[in-house]
């Protein structure tokens, strides 16, 4: 039987993804996604905000979740990643100096 902790477990897993190895491998989310934004702009000529970049990653994960749900499957890793990207959005917002907002980056 499933327990109520299953929902909380994936939140903890996502937290560990973005604060553990991910943070060690890629560094602070603002620094990491500032590079992503620069590369994307160089390739496309389009300037993304920090929130745009992170929400784009959430969109990628949501599209993959939809594809799997249409096949009556739930891909756990993709779900954890989507939650993690939302956590990174929150972290980026809180890491930016006042009065900057995520949307202004």
Task: Tell what function each PLM region has.
Residues 1-105:
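Intrinsically disordered, low-complexity regulatory regions
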């Amino acid at each position: 039987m499933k327990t109520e902790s299953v929902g909380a477990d994936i939140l903890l897993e996502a937290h560990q993804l973005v604060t553990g190895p991910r943070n060690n491998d890629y560094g602070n989310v603002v620094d990491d996604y500032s590079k992503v934004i620069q590369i994307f702009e160089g390739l496309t000529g389009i300037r993304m905000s920090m929130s745009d970049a992170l929400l784009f990653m959430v969109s990628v994960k949501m599209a993959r979740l939809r594809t799997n749900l249409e096949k009556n499957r739930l891909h756990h890793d993709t779900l954890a990643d989507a939650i993690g990207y939302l956590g990174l959005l929150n972290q980026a917002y809180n890491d930016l100096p006042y009065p900057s907002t995520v949307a202004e980056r």
